[in-house]
Amino acid sequence: MSKLLSSLLLGLVCVAAFGQRITHDFENVPLSEAIKYIQESTNRYSIIFIYNELEDFPVTISLQDEPVTDALEHVIGFYPVSMKVENGKIFIECTHKTARHLSGKVLDENGDPLAFADVAVYSADDGNAGGNGAMTGSGVTNESGIFVIPIEANRNRVEVSFIGYKKCSRYVTGEDAGTLQMQVEALAIDGAVVKGERPAYKMAKGGFSVDVQHTMLSQVGSAVDVLGQMPRVRVNGSGEITVASKGSPLIYINNRKMNDANELNRLKSEQIKSVEVITNPGAEYDATIGAVIKIRTMRNTDEGISIRNDANVNYRIDNNFGGSEELNLSWRKGKLELINDASWTRHVMGEDNKGSLEYVYMTEQKVKDEMTADNIDENFAMDYAINDSCSVGAKYNFMKRTKGDIKLDGSYSVYKDGKMLGNISQNWQNEYLAGPSHQADVYYVGKMGKMGVDFNGSYMFTKNTEESAVRETSEELKDQTVTSASVMRGQLYAAKLVLSYPLWKGSLNFGSEYSNTKTDGSYKNEENIIEASEYKIEEGNMAGFGEYALSLGKWNANAGLRYEHVKSDYFAFGVRQDDASRKYDDLFPSISVSRQFGKWDLQLSMNRKTRRPSYHQLRNNLQYDNRYAYEGGNPQLRPQITTSVDFYAVRGWLTFSSGYSHYKDPIMFITKQYNDTVALVTFDNIRENDRLYSSVTASPDLGIYKPLFEIDYEQQFIDGKQLGVTHRLNNPSFAFIVNNRFRLSQSFSGSVDLYACTDSDGGFSHDKGYFSASAWIRKSFFDDRLSLRLSANDIFRSEKERWIRFGNGIVSTKDCYNYTQRVSFTVTYMFNYRSRKYKGTGAGNAEKRRL
């Protein structure tokens, strides 16, 4: 196996020709330091410059996969600095040889940095009160709103202009112009209102990037609320996040894999710099990943202690309260930063459900249930910057569910051949506890000479236990009690190494990843109505990957290849099950090509991915629903293989995407025959199916009104005859989204969000359409140190789950309201607060999600 991996990686090194590219975040560093970093990342060019004369020009910019020359042009920006490329050498020098520079910062009407504003400097040494002296210099602000302009005179007049804003000017003595804040001025031209704005969307490799920092998205609440505003991203009433046509995404926060969904609630929108949605992940990502979301936060380099406290209470329409309390403490001194985040959360969920199941017997059921879960989380992280290009760190997470009560009361009627046999009352008491779970991560990011090194190691342990007692009473049919207990444990060791090295005219990126997972579980039923079960799964995954990027003028291309060897052994009661054990050797290619046509960015991409069944889906135990219906896993499941082609077009605040996916051995949720009287809800593979999808999003900036409009189309093409499903489920579906966002001032904003969808077909289910509305307002005080947020979800109580599911001679229905109507109030207080930035990415991330 090791020889095969070595041969693969050697082949990747030998055959790849890579376009050298730079990816790095510069946070208020001198231009000379930025150029020095780029020089150390290339062996194609020699960069010649005088270090001292460029020290006065600060640089704040995020470079993402850019060629060396483009990267240099972007860090230089509009500073008075020239660049010349000649015979493999790049000459950079300041065009104004003066020891004095006038610097300042420009903000927009909301107090955010204003990039690309024109700055002119006029001499005022002549004492002209009108300020009409000769213009002695000019420049443009960078992404941080900062300008630096060489000057000769001691007293000057600074004038700032930007389309859509009133001109702003002031007299300055010395070299510090301070902060200048612009005021909006809408210009009427032939009846049209023209206002300056930033591009809302940008093309990214395999997807698109959305600016959060400079938009009102920074005020919507938590990271969950931000993701709910992203094109193609869906957040349901339970907080579950999916990407249209791609499933559940892998989410990274500052390149670190998110494993606890509560992190998104703890991360606040004002901490977020940008969000990148990748619908065609490259070879670096596990082959099971269909979509990736990358969240980048802002970083403050101030030293000392910072504190943030968030208190939330929410009221559900059925008279239940939930809430959370979170305290974040961080301390920074020199190169060391320590972070501690502790939280307590109470989740309150429930449903009012009507359902039916038609098999040998027909049942009509009415159920009301509620769940209360109390979780405690403790997170500790450490980062140490060895130098500007090397850092190490570690992170530990502890989680335990201290309370997990589910209470259900209901009844169901039983029919056969149209004749009612009786009524059964059902009471269900369930205790579901999670944890304690432990996760530890370590990382190293740095350089060894010109080779970039990114190493991550992870350990994870999880435990879930469940005890339930179901009591059924009936006058016509016999009484029955089912008591059960189950437990599931999981343990993971993982490591990932990514190396990058300048090679010929490009940069070679390659690496390997290894994970070892052990899970076991058992189920016992005292009355022996359902057979006891016990299973263990041992799985190892070894992967090697390589990726390159090539830039040819306005064209950009990326290609990658990932090889995975997976060996899985399945045991039942200690005996290896040969028919359920698996071994796979697969190649997963990915490629994307993009080009800029004027203001349009176009991209076409293709990849091959897999979806391995989760350990929950592979379990061999059953769950008792009622005496005519069980739920369970399927140890015989095979991995699903997906081949996708996606097209993106981006221009400013407008995006369009369209794609096609082919699924081989797709994993389906289906109802099957368990025995002569009982139906089993489980999972199975079918031969293949296909899916088409498209999305159009517009997010214009109309002054205080900043709406988002989105229309989505999706249609599956499926044949379920092999599993006995003859119903046609190939109808198209549409979703319509209107988020009416407004920002009255820097401290006051809000939104009314509307969502509607038509009937849709997914797998073997026909889902009914619905409409929902939600709203929120936010007000901050004391320079944003204190903020209040009030929100209302599902205002008209119309977000219902209604479907018809078809099986092999079995039809089931559900008409359910999940009590998503609720009101929430959050108070946040910050003292010297800065956002966290643990730099590790984690290892074995797909396995963590399966656990």
Q: Each PLM stretch: what is its role?
A:
Residues 41-42, 79, 85, 89-99, ...:
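Short, acidic, small-residue-rich periplasmic hinge/interaction motif at the N-terminus
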Residues 492-496, 541-543, 638, 644, ...:
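Outer membrane beta-barrel strand-and-loop segments of large Gram-negative receptors
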